[in-house]
From Swiss-Prot:
It comes from Magnetospirillum gryphiswaldense (strain DSM 6361 / JCM 21280 / NBRC 15271 / MSR-1). It is found in: Magnetosome membrane. GO terms for biological process: proteolysis. Residues 365-632 are annotated as: TSUP-like. This is Probable membrane transporter protein MamO. Keywords: Biomineralization, Magnetosome, Membrane, Metal-binding, Transmembrane, Transmembrane helix, Transport.
Amino acid sequence: MIEIGETMGDQPTNKIVFCERSWKAPVSILAFLILVTFAWGAYLLDNYDEDDYFRGSDDMSVGQFLVRNVAMPDVQRLYYTVPPAVVGVGGGGVNAGPVASGAIVGANGYVITTLHSVANVPDITVQVATSAGIRRFPAQVVKTIPGHNLALLKLQTTEKFLHFRMANIQTVVPGQQVFAFGRNMAGAPLVRQGMVQSSDAPLAVGTTQITHLLRSDAVYSWEQTGGPLVNAQGDLVGINIAATGPTGKVEGFTVPAQVIVSHLQDVVRFKTGGAAGVAPPAAQTVAMGSSSWWSKAKAVVGGPTAVPGMGMNVVQGTVTTGIPSGMPFVDTDHVGGAKIGGYSIADILGLGMLALAAGVTGGMMTMGGGVLQVAGMMVFFGYGMYLIRPVVFLTNVVVYGAAALRNDKAQLVQWDKVKPLIPWGVAGVVIGYFIGNAIGDSVVGVLLGLFALIMAGKAVLEILQPNAGEDTAEAIAAAEAGDEMDELMALAEGTTRPKTSGIALPEGPTRSAVLGLPMGLFSGILGISGGVIEVPLQRYIGRISLQNAIANSSVLVFWASVAGSVVAFIHGGSTGLIHWEAPVTLALVMIPGAYVGGILGARLMRVLPVRVLKGIYAATMAAIAIKMLTTV
């Protein structure tokens, strides 16, 4: 029996020595080649999705990129080059697909799309094709133009992007070859070649009648809505609107480039294309077999009908077709005229008048001017809160800084009471700024409308009080009992007295927080000055005279606005939401009007009857409330 572990007999000696064999060298070479193969594979896996074709294209327009290596681009290069500047616009859900297309018009990530597509989207996300594949960027509305169904978005990033330059209006002629781009539900690009058919075609979107539109048969699907219509040079002719006609088929409209530039050049510094080159022959447009996405995206003549709910109904009107072939379109409403810093004279006057009205309102009633300024910039000029906040903060720094200096010179500022409140006001505006950004412009608009409604109701109740506004000694005495209307009259006469009623809080951090924090929060969230909150707090909790309350509030608003400006520019700049030029320019336009309006309002307070002042204030706040609450 043999036990495990034992050996049986003598084993032969192994005389084969591996290292002495002749195949040592081939095996070593093979092992080396295997290592090289794995290293090369790792490199390919790490870099397989990068596309050298677009390398170095940051901060370039599509037209510039097309002619970088050739004198005149062919259509095949156009099909391949344009899609990176075409984006998909949708919601913020993980699996949410695009609700519209869009066009990048600024290297810093400015995107134009159709307003109706994003009006009810709470968290806007933009899908951008990059050399590393499709990337999703959060975006915010910077400005809207309801009259032309346009929305300007800003990607929340500091990266640079390939973008469109605007076509010269003199190069757009009837019969011109154009290409309508978009992105489908899967995010893949689609395009159709067509031509410019006519100009000034009417289109109704809801209750809004849009004019100055182009007609083009290149638009065949709702997925092209918001996407670019480009010419053979890669320049942006306009933004597409796909509308369902009476037969259910898609009819193509385009908001032309000159309209876009006219309304948005205050925010974006557009590049403009030069004279038109020779258009490539039509025969070149059919060969795209080398591009797989083009094979999938080719449109059938006539196109599919629009997806239900995604198109818009066309209001049938007379389409202009009498322009001779080869003649350029003429749009005197949007082309020409004096511009200052990208603003038309009409826009400068409008912004100045809004600032003047806000200043007068604040000067007459010592509050409410900021509400009017913010609401006016949202409703009449279409600006988003990301741009409004820094503008209002900068305006307040100048206006309330000057007011604080005047009040300090008149020895009305109670520094011993104000200094403990400043840190709370600064903290409040910082917190409020981020809360306002988080809840979005739509919610801010509702809150602003509700706030204005409350202020209007308060003013109406004061008007309805017995003996309101009577110029008598009893009216002055009534200020001590809390009659706000007569306090206003007493302020005009310089006879206000300390408040004897109200809420008594002991000195300390709690009292400072109650007096300083709410003003900062409201200022940061709504973008208003906060004086409308701080003056009553100073009166009823601080228990001081109306003159001292206004003086103390001017100091708090000044420091809160300084903090708000710093936060808005640092946060906005670091996230790519704003660039300093636009808010600074807007502030420079509005500051003179707000300053002069404040002085004029203070004089009107001394001239007009208090009941009239309260009536004007109530009507103004009511109008703001109605407009804000009915447009959301």
